[in-house]
Amino acid sequence: MDKFNPVDMSVWQGRQDPEDGELALRWHDKVQPWPQAGRAAPGVALVGFACDEGVRRNKGRVGAAGAPLAVRKLLANSAWHLGRPVYDRGDVNCEDGDLDAAHGRLAERVARLLDEGHFPLVLGGGHEVAFGSWSGLNRHLAGRGRVGIINFDAHFDLRMKLEQASSGTPFFQIAEQCAIQGTPFTYACLGVAETANTQALFARAEALGVWHVLDEAMTPAELPALLSGLDAFIARCDHLYLTIDLDVLPAAVMPGVSAPAARGVELAVIEPLIAHIRASGKLRLADLAEYNPSLDQDNRSARVAARLVHQLIK
């Protein structure tokens, strides 16, 4: 098996409504394979990160490696409302548990896509995907401007990397790399569950200057305040990387994750925030993490993940 697999385009199939012509197109009609030669016109490039090694190391429930394929299958039959090309750039795999190598391959792929003018949308995989995604953006920018990371997540994912990286360490790894480079670590974590993060993690977040909002404060009534806070954060940044850990959503909406949320944040709050981030014109890269098809119920979680893909790029 190749370490970077082109996806089987047969996954992109679904309903046909020929009686309605061009207005009845779905994703399976429009998603394009990556060209074998030459450059593709700038568009959205889907990249799968078929890896849950970080989840295993973090003592979570594995299965997220199957997420990229499952999300593609749900996207395939979704109605098409986009005005730019979408390409399937295949999957990065984690072979023999070598997460560092998988991170390196993802970073290389993301950087190259950015260099060629595309918007990479990475489909994880465990949240270890974040270090690979950010590393690609960091490589592409090469110090040009300040990067802000916005993470919708019930967890800070600021665990210290002792012997190995995991799904709990990506933002600590990024903070370490920023310190080495002498660049600011600008991180927002929105939807934090107090009971899912130790006092040590809250202290580390404070020491690193992380802007965080608890899940209980992320309600429709608080949306104006959230948008104001987001504006202040975005104003400090030249470029944005948005990462969505799907366990930020309520367990009833998102059962298919390793650590379902006891409370979570509603889509009615998250979607306007995504739209606001997009409207800033600074969003360069996004990813989804932690969807686990083996824990899903009637594809409920996959449908939500597919909806969020649409929200990220519409």
UniProtKB/Swiss-Prot annotation:
Sites where the protein binds Mn(2+) 2: D153, H155, D245, D247
Keywords associated with the record: Histidine metabolism, Hydrolase, Manganese, Metal-binding
GO molecular function, one term: agmatinase activity
Cofactor dependence: Mn(2+)
Any GO BP annotation: putrescine biosynthetic process from arginine, via agmatine
Pathway(s) where this gene product acts: Amino-acid degradation; L-histidine degradation into L-glutamate; L-glutamate from N-formimidoyl-L-glutamate (hydrolase route): step 1/1
UniProt binding sites for Mn(2+) 1: H127, D153, D157, D245
Enzyme class: hydrolase
Catalytic activity: N-formimidoyl-L-glutamate + H2O = formamide + L-glutamate
Entry similarity comment: Belongs to the arginase family.
Function description: Catalyzes the conversion of N-formimidoyl-L-glutamate to L-glutamate and formamide.
Protein's recorded name: Formimidoylglutamase
Gene: hutG
